[in-house]
A protein has these predicted regions:
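Short catalytic-loop micro-motif centered on adjacent basic/acidic residues
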Residues: 8-12
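PLD/PLD-like phosphodiesterase catalytic module centered on the HKD motif
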Residues: 15-203
Length: 203
């Protein structure tokens, strides 16, 4: 990542950057690198403990200029709708979808030129405990297409986190062509928010 000059995309289902890596990502932005991150939203995350560990870093990332996105739990519905309208959907694709989705893809893209794809999550367990595999290779055409599709599709399948005038987080997305803004974790119960918030204090 140190050699990244223009653009960095991180897609990781479990994303717990820690203080040091959060500061590092913000430093990339400070030197002119566009940083985009996609991870699971609270509703889409199947491990509340991971989300609890991640949520404390969101404000610092967003305030530092990182473009932070959280995957919607109903993203599969959006993708299937797009496929139907474009005529691209097949019976096989229809069987793959589910009413509740969770992000599982794991990859990094550097300067729209290099890709890293593998089993590695950006959380403490992957870094310190798990044995992970990945492939790093140059593919400018694939990396550029990925970057373009990220921008084109992201607000349909994810929420973008920003800060409101009071410095609190807000979640922006598109639904049926309209922009929607949420001021708490979207599509979650008060208990889910409370319990995960409590976990964030102790993890």
């Amino acid at each position: 990542m140190d050699k990244t000059q223009r653009d960095l995309i991180i897609v990781s289902p479990y994303f717990v950057p820690g203080d040091e890596f959060t500061g590092y990502l913000v430093s990339l932005v400070d030197r002119g690198v566009r940083v985009r991150i996609l991870t699971n939203s609270l509703q889409a995350n199947d491990v509340s403990m991971v989300h609890a560990g991640y949520m404390r870093y969101r404000k610092d990332l967003v305030a530092g200029g990182v473009e932070l996105f959280e995957f919607k739990a109903d993203a599969n519905k959006v993708v299937r709708k797009e496929n139907r309208e474009s005529g691209a959907e097949t019976k096989e694709k229809r069987r793959i979808g589910a009413s509740k989705a969770s992000l599982h893809a794991k990859f990094f893209s550097f300067d729209e030129t290099y890709l890293f794809i593998g089993s590695f999550n950006l959380d403490g367990r992957s870094v310190a405990l798990n044995s992970e595999l990945g492939a790093y290779y140059a593919s400018p055409e694939e990396a550029k297409l990925l970057s373009q599709e990220f921008d084109e599709m992201i607000l349909q399948i994810a929420y973008q986190l920003t800060l409101d005038e009071s410095g609190d987080l807000q979640w922006t997305t598109e639904r049926n062509g309209e922009e929607l803004v949420f001021f708490k974790e979207p599509d979650t119960t008060w208990w889910k928010r409370f319990s995960t918030g409590f976990l964030s204090i102790i993890v």
